[in-house]
Amino acid sequence: MQLYNTMTRTKEPFVSRVPGKVAMYVCGITAYDLCHIGHARSSVVFDVLVRYLRHIGFDVTFVRNFTDVDDKIIKKANAEGTTSQEIAERYIATFYEDMDKLGILRPNAEPKATEYIGEMASLAQRLIDSGHAYRTPSGDVYFRVRSFAGYGKLSGRDVEDMRSGARVAPGEEKEDPLDFALWKASKPGEPVWESPFGPGRPGWHLECSAMSEKLLGMPIDIHGGGQDLIFPHHENEIAQSEAAIGGEFCRYWVHNGFVRINTEKMSKSLGNFITIRDIYARYLPEVLRFFLLSSQYRSPLDYSDQGLDEAEKGIKRIYAAKVQMEQALGRAKWSETKLPADVTEELSRHEEGFTAAMDDDLNTAQAMGHVFGLVRLAGRLMEDKTLAKSRETAEVLGRILADFGVWAEVLGVFGTDATAFLADLKACRLTRLGIDAARVDGLVAERQDARKAKDFARSDAIRDELASLGVTVMDTPTGPQWDIA
């Protein structure tokens, strides 16, 4: 498997530090508000990475943190007249609700920053002792950026360029404008902990370094997050961790691309974000997950209702194909008709193609293409009146269903009961489009009566009325069935 390493700006063969084992850390949410679709993308990307690494045989220890002490949390708590802890607990709970519906597997460990204050203070003290950090008279602790020769290597930024125009804000006691906070001295209205440098709270960057070292050891194999974290957060993590341990902090840096709305990065700070719950109000969670897997994870993803509609159609095709294959395999008797040689070749090509796509920097978009390739292959076999009866067709369909079962575990989609999913999808679409199912059932029954009475003018009029609602009717041997176009 190859992964794109942000540090080297190239795809590299993935080789773990300890053979067969992977230590992986991903920056989690700052728990002060509902999660948006950008959080959903990052969660899905790294969930699939963990799933695939396990699929190909790695024992993955996955850690994802919660930032439960931060300026934004404190600001919200003060505005609501409550505590930072209450705010953090509230939004950690909503995070779990959203992510469980999205099919995100729970990590091996989910540390909260406030649970590791001692480790953070210890790390800051080590940096002070080694000359990489300093305590100010007011009790703040800053990291000396210029003391770390590799600063900027992840983001590709030059220290001198960053220094140009930078200023120390009034009231700050930094030696250099580039220095960043490891520990913030206590202030009224903020949570506080004791430390060797006096009462205060940790800086944001310190927590991930301390928790990853404590829970995973150094160096970790994979550190993940959104591209917005490359600078300053991950750059600062590298500086403080490598300055403290005197060696490599992380071997592979993996970052997912932004979600964009109207070509702009979506974020809370820009005020153009769409919460996950906004989407769940109109689409099934699995449709959102499918949509997020429709592009390569490093590429920008443009959000739109049209994109979700296309994802809905796509996942419906897969589930419908599963139902058709399961029904086809219920045949009591099979012929010995031989399949063309290219059928098994096509099947193998898509199976190998799926693996090759996932091995190529987790290219889920290309992998999905091979899923649909097997949907088309199954459709051709079932539609051919002669081949549909062949025992060899049954073997191919069984193999495709088995492939889908394995791939569903890897991707986290199309793995539930197909009939139940299609019923839920239909109900969701009816609600979103404002279509009354009872009215449709009545019109379909009325059309059926008209057909029996050979009143084809009335039957056609009802069909047109249904079409105006976006409903199509299929006449089957067991009676009419309808769906939303």
Swiss-Prot record:
Zn(2+) binds at residues 27, 208, 233, 237. Its main location: cytoplasm. It is found in: Cytoplasm. GO terms for biological process: cysteinyl-tRNA aminoacylation. GO terms for cellular component: cytosol. ATP binds at residue 268. Gene3D superfamilies: Cysteine-tRNA ligase, C-terminal anti-codon recognition domain, HUPs. Its cofactor is Zn(2+). A motif ('KMSKS' region) lies at residues 265-269. Its EC number is 6.1.1.16. Binds 1 zinc ion per subunit. InterPro entries: Cys-tRNA-ligase (IPR015803), Cys-tRNA-synt_Ia_DALR (IPR015273), Cys-tRNA/MSH_ligase (IPR024909), CysS_C (IPR056411), Rossmann-like_a/b/a_fold (IPR014729), tRNA-synt_1_cat_dom (IPR032678), tRNAsynth_Ia_anticodon-bd (IPR009080). A motif ('HIGH' region) lies at residues 29-39. It catalyses: tRNA(Cys) + L-cysteine + ATP = L-cysteinyl-tRNA(Cys) + AMP + diphosphate. One of its GO terms (molecular function) is zinc ion binding. Keywords: Aminoacyl-tRNA synthetase, ATP-binding, Cytoplasm, Ligase, Metal-binding, Nucleotide-binding, Protein biosynthesis, Zinc. Belongs to the class-I aminoacyl-tRNA synthetase family. PANTHER family: CYSTEINE--TRNA LIGASE, CYTOPLASMIC, CYSTEINYL-TRNA SYNTHETASE. Monomer. HAMAP family: Cys_tRNA_synth. This is Cysteine--tRNA ligase. It comes from Solidesulfovibrio magneticus (strain ATCC 700980 / DSM 13731 / RS-1). The lineage of its organism: Bacteria, Pseudomonadati, Thermodesulfobacteriota, Desulfovibrionia, Desulfovibrionales.
